[in-house]
Design a protein with these regions (language model features):
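Subtilisin-like serine protease catalytic core
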Residues: 90-224, 240-241
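Charged/polar, solvent-exposed surface patches and flexible loops
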Residues: 25-29, 126, 227, 234
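Short acidic, glycine-rich surface-loop motifs adjacent to enzyme active sites
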Residues: 69, 229-241
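Autoinhibitory propeptides
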Residues: 2-11, 15-100, 107-123
């Protein structure tokens, strides 16, 4: 079974499964009927050909098998919790230096100076764009998104090209609030922190139909978010921050 692009194919459906860490056992069980991506040592995503009774199966299979869908947070709530005032007051002198802030959202505007250092280089250490299908070596999982290094993002900045493109603007906004650099009239909460970015792909139409979510509404799958968290965790361990 070819599994390279099942994260995007509408003729395959996603199931979130819990296992006990024995990956070989899971692979053996589903080797002829589906494809498996392991999120961590507890959860995995099973991709199987969409059954004819997919909609009906929602009522007879365990609810937790079906990834939930999530939308975007209203950006007005950021000011409501006082996040903007934390850095403006600067009472504690905290700048975020030597820490990593992970953003799992709609992408980020890499050309924005708020996310660059004093010499115009990116503060993004690494990024995983789930919305751009990759090859065997370019995704966090085979065929599932494209991973960029900080050097590759710097090259894109120099060339004036865009990766991690944020069509919505939500991810760029939240990244700016969290750790945007200092300007004359704006400072993020942690202006000297580094970033690791995960750009989520939009939810599949087959799952939208299951939950009644319109095609034109931004919606993101639980398993994609969980995979993003696992990616951030691995990067934090790698950088020891």
């Amino acid at each position: 079974m070819i599994c390279d692009d099942v994260a995007y194919r509408e003729d395959y459906v996603d199931y979130l499964i819990e296992y006990n860490g024995e990956t070989e056992t899971v692979l053996d069980i589903y080797k002829d009927t589906g494809c498996v991506n392991f999120i961590d040592e507890r959860f995995a995503v099973l991709y199987r050909p969409k059954p004819d009774d997919y909609m009906e199966s929602f009522s007879r299979l365990e609810y937790t098998l079906f990834p939930k869908l999530y939308g975007l947070m209203d950006t007005s709530s950021v000011e409501a919790v006082g996040a903007v005032n934390v850095q403006q007051e600067n009472i504690l002198g905290l700048t975020g230096k030597n820490i990593i802030i992970g953003i799992i959202d709609t992408g980020i505007d890499i050309q924005n100076p708020l996310f660059q250092n004093a010499v115009g280089q990116t503060r993004i250490l690494a990024a995983w764009d789930q919305s751009v299908p990759g090859g065997e070596q370019t995704g966090e999982f085979p065929g599932y998104g494209t991973v960029y290094t900080g050097d590759e993002i710097n090259e894109a900045i120099r060339n004036g090209t865009s990766v991690l493109q944020d069509e919505n603007g939500h991810g760029t906004f939240l990244a700016g609030i969290a750790a945007g650099g200092k300007t004359d009239d704006f400072t993020g909460v942690a202006p000297e922190a580094d970033f690791v970015i995960v750009k989520l792909k939009q939810a599949k139409q087959n799952l939208r139909g299951l939950y009644g979510v319109p095609e034109d509404v931004d919606a993101y799958q639980e398993n994609d978010i969980m995979a993003g968290v696992a990616y951030l965790t691995r990067l934090a361990e790698r950088y020891r921050r």
